Amino acid sequence: YGEFYERPIDDEELIREGEKIAQQIIERLRMRPELEDVPILIGLFKQEARNSIVPGSYLQYAVSSPGKNSLGDWVQLKEKYVSFPMSSPEDIYRDINDAFNKFKHEIDLYFSNITSVIGTGFYKENRIQKLEVEIPIQFFGTAEIIGFTQYLTGVMLSKLPQDLPVVISITSMNGPEALIKKMPNEDEPFVHIYE
């Protein structure tokens, strides 16, 4: 409720200020008797903009050993969520973006009433770890949902990378309609149609 204010903060400033605040948090937590002799882990998380489809990402973390009032060395995390399709992807996202665009194009060819196919990729150490796809639909009957789900399963197997975990959620105004889940190098995905 009320106004929301946000401004972009570059990673360097976020890390510098986050490390200062983390140290203050450790000092405050250690004042509590029940937290004097336990390890405490603190992570720095970068929140994406309010209108972003993807969540934020952890940038780094550090541990305060039991009984210590300071943090150990910070460990960098090279993790990032990205959304697909991208209009001008960086090199590390290009292959998945191309595959995703082919996947989306196949859906658009046969189901032109689908307005959006939204993908979220999770990258770690600049390598994709998983792909989640959300497809809101406006079909009216169970038979249409079953047919669309079967079609999607085939398109997923032919257009998306085989060595990648992929989860496709089909939703409507009524909630979840179907789920397709494929683990790396599986020939047959798990398919569930909600009743």
Regions picked out by a protein language model, each given a short descriptive name:
Residues 101-113:
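Short amphipathic alpha-helix segments
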Residues 1, 111-137:
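Short edge beta-strands and adjacent turn/loop segments
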Residues 28-39, 52-54:
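Extended, H/D-rich, highly charged conserved domains that either
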Residues 8-34, 143-165:
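Short, non-transmembrane amphipathic alpha-helical segments
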Residues 33-47, 159-182:
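A short amphipathic beta-strand at an alpha->beta junction
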Residues 1-10, 77-89, 129-136:
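Acidic/histidine-rich, surface-exposed loop or edge segments in extracytoplasmic proteins
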Residues 180-195:
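C-terminal region signature
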Residues 46-95, 101:
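Aromatic/basic-lined ligand-recognition segments
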